[in-house]
């Protein structure tokens, strides 16, 4: 695994672990279907370095952190809720609400950057007559508008057409 120590920016590489997902029905199904191989489900956990204010602008390991986060299917955010002078904290002291809000804010800002770049691209394409570009631009404007108001992409509501245009965007 990657190094993990008690000081900021010590964890550069991600730590990865895999755990089986128990399924009592798996053997029953195998008995009925007789497959050549039975492969139980598993879940892969990726522990990545934390972030600091300004990560969405590349500060600290921000760009690397956000790239790792974009590659996962789900995010489990673990927040430190204890004070211990022997365990360093990037801001000097643990404040769970502030720390959780920091991550959420950095995600919103990073997503806003993605949405605004896509909006610019599709707006230009719409001016040159590219098919569906106006619809794509409208979808990204919807996202950008919500993010500017502090609403995460996951909390916004989209039409099926908007979802088609947003599908490859890898929002956090």
List the predicted regions and their residue ranges.
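Conserved G1/Walker A P-loop phosphate-binding module
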Residues: 1-88, 97, 104-106, 115-117, ...
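Charge-rich, low-complexity amphipathic helices
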Residues: 15-17, 34, 51, 91, ...
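Alpha-helical scaffold segments in soluble metabolic enzymes
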Residues: 28, 102, 114, 139-142, ...
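Short secondary-structure junctions and interdomain/linker hinges
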Residues: 36-39, 110, 114, 147-154
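Amphipathic alpha-helical coiled-coil segments with heptad-repeat character
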Residues: 62, 93, 100, 105, ...
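C-terminal-of-GTPase-core extension/linker across diverse P-loop GTPases
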Residues: 118-172
């Amino acid at each position: 695994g990657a190094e993990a120590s008690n000081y900021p920016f010590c964890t550069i590489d991600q730590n990865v672990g895999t755990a089986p997902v128990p399924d009592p029905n798996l053997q029953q199904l195998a008995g009925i279907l007789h497959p050549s191989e039975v492969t139980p489900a598993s879940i892969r956990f990726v522990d990545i370095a934390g972030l600091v204010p300004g990560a969405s602008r590349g500060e600290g390991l921000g760009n690397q952190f956000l790239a790792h986060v974009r590659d996962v299917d789900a995010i489990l955010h673990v927040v430190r809720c204890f004070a211990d002078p022997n365990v360093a904290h990037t801001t000097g002291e643990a404040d769970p609400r502030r720390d959780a809000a920091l991550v959420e804010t950095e995600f919103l800002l990073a997503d806003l950057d993605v949405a605004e770049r896509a909006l610019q691209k599709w707006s230009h394409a719409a001016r040159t007559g590219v098919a569906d570009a106006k619809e794509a631009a409208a979808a990204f404007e919807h996202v950008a508008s919500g993010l500017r108001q502090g609403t995460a992409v996951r909390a916004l509501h989209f039409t099926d057409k908007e979802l088609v245009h947003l599908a490859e965007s890898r929002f956090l």
